[in-house]
Amino acid sequence: MASGRARCTRKLRNWVVEQVESGQFPGVCWDDTAKTMFRIPWKHAGKQDFREDQDAAFFKAWAIFKGKYKEGDTGGPAVWKTRLRCALNKSSEFKEVPERGRMDVAEPYKVYQLLPPGIVSGQPGTQKVPSKRQHSSVSSERKEEEDAMQNCTLSPSVLQDSLNNEEEGASGGAVHSDIGSSSSSSSPEPQEVTDTTEAPFQGDQRSLEFLLPPEPDYSLLLTFIYNGRVVGEAQVQSLDCRLVAEPSGSESSMEQVLFPKPGPLEPTQRLLSQLERGILVASNPRGLFVQRLCPIPISWNAPQAPPGPGPHLLPSNECVELFRTAYFCRDLVRYFQGLGPPPKFQVTLNFWEESHGSSHTPQNLITVKMEQAFARYLLEQTPEQQAAILSLV
C-alpha cells in the first residue's frame, strides 16, 4: 500500500529538467515561460508514422539512465514509455496536466507540471476521475440510475486500490442468494455464496502496472446470443452503460446499448419485453461490475464467480463484481511464467424465461458475453512480448 510519505524522486526531477533544457529530444520542451510545465511527445508505437529514434528517444534515454536497457536487450518503445509513465505517476514531484496536453492531433503530447518541494500531488499512482456533471434538476429516473451506478463505478486508481483491498474478497460482498420476487420454484436456484478471498499477490504490487499497455483500453466488448446464435456485437467506450431493449426518453447521460431486435413472434422478443429498466454495466480499471434492474432472472459465470457449479444469480438492485483487473494481471504473470493456465477474462450473463407451471422447464433464451478489450490484448502477446513484460515485473 502506498504510504502518505512523499516519495523521494530527486534523481528523476533533476534528470527531467536537464533533458528538457538540453533540447536534444524533439518535442520535449517547456510548456510555459516560468518553466514549471513541460511537454512529452506521446505518439502510440503502433502508428504508421511512428519514428522510434525520435518519438521514443526520451523514454529510451530514461531506461538507459536507470540501467534498465542496453543495446540488444528485449523490450521496445511501449516498455520504455511505461517505465517513465509509472515513474512520473508515482512521484510526488510531478503532476499531469491533462487540460494542456493534446492527444487528438497528429503529433500528440502530454504535459506534466513540476511541483514545488513540499507540495504533494496526491496518492502516488492514482488518477483523478472527473465527477459526473451536476444539474439543478434531473428526472427521478436519471437520479436512480446515477445512484445505482455509484457503487459500481469504483475509483479507477489503476491497480493499487484493487491490490490493497484483496482481503475484501473476490465477490465484492455484493452477491446474495435471494433474487426477490423474480424467482420461482422452477427457475434456477441460487447457491449459497461463500467467501472467495484469494491469497494476495506475493511480490511488488506496483510492478503489476507494467503489465498494462501505456494507454490501456478498458472499453467493453459485448456479444449478443439468442438461442445459441450470435446476433450482434458492440463495443462501448464509456465507463458505464445500460443494456436495454428500447431506448429510454430520460435525460440520463449514461450511454444506452440496445439489444438486437428479434422477430416479433420469437420467444426472445417476449423475454426482451420484460427487460424494462435493463442492466447497468461499469467497465473501468478496477474491473467489470453489473447491476440488475429488470425482473428477469439472470445467472452469471465469470472469473469472480464463487465456488460451486452454480447457477449464480444476480441479486436485484445490487452491484456485483464479476471481473477484477488485479487478479487477472496476477494470474497473467503466472501464465507467462509457465506456472498456470491462461487467466479467464470473459463474463457470461444468461437471461432466463420465467416458468409457467410445473411442467415448464426454464429456458436460457438470451446470453450476453462481455469482456474488457485490454485483457484479450494482453493474452495475445507474442512470446517475445511476454518475455519483455516479465522483465519488468
Swiss-Prot record:
Residues recorded as bearing Phosphoserine in the entry: 139
Signal peptide: none
Entry annotated with the keyword Manganese: no
Keywords: Activator, Antiviral defense, Cytoplasm, DNA-binding, Nucleus, Phosphoprotein, Transcription, Transcription regulation, Ubl conjugation
Post-translational modification, as annotated: (Microbial infection) Ubiquitinated by Herpes simplex virus 2 E3 ubiquitin ligase ICP22.
Induction / repression: By IFN-alpha and IFNB1/IFN-beta.
GO BP terms, alphabetized: cell surface receptor signaling pathway; defense response to virus; immune system process; positive regulation of transcription by RNA polymerase II; regulation of transcription by RNA polymerase II; transcription by RNA polymerase II
Pfam entry (one): IRF-3
Keyword RNA-binding attributed: no
Molecular functions (GO terms): DNA-binding transcription factor activity; DNA-binding transcription factor activity, RNA polymerase II-specific; RNA polymerase II cis-regulatory region sequence-specific DNA binding; sequence-specific double-stranded DNA binding
Effect of residue 81 to R: Loss of transcriptional activation in response to type I interferon stimulation. Impaired anti-viral immunity
DNA-binding region positions on the chain: 9-116
Region called Disordered, residue ranges: 120-151, 163-202
Gene Ontology annotations for the cellular component aspect, listed alphabetically: chromatin; cytoplasm; cytosol; ISGF3 complex; nucleoplasm; nucleus
Intracellular or extracellular location(s): Cytoplasm; Nucleus
Organism superkingdom: Eukaryota
Family: Belongs to the IRF family.
UniProt function note: Transcription factor that plays an essential role in anti-viral immunity. It mediates signaling by type I IFNs (IFN-alpha and IFN-beta). Following type I IFN binding to cell surface receptors, Jak kinases (TYK2 and JAK1) are activated, leading to tyrosine phosphorylation of STAT1 and STAT2. IRF9/ISGF3G associates with the phosphorylated STAT1:STAT2 dimer to form a complex termed ISGF3 transcription factor, that enters the nucleus. ISGF3 binds to the IFN stimulated response element (ISRE) to activate the transcription of interferon stimulated genes, which drive the cell in an antiviral state.
Annotated disease: Immunodeficiency 65: An autosomal recessive immunologic disorder characterized by recurrent viral infections from early infancy. Clinical consequences are pneumonia, bronchiectasis, and septic shock. Affected individuals have lymphopenia or hypogammaglobulinemia, particularly during infection, and impaired cellular type I interferon response. Patients may have adverse response to vaccination with live attenuated vaccines.
Subunit structure, as described in the record: Interacts with STAT2 in the cytoplasm. Forms the interferon-stimulated gene factor 3 complex (ISGF3) with the heterodimer STAT1:STAT2; upon stimulation. (Microbial infection) Interacts with measles virus V protein; this interaction prevents the binding of IRF9 to STAT2 and thereby the type I interferon signaling pathway.
Name the UniProt record assigns to this protein: Interferon regulatory factor 9
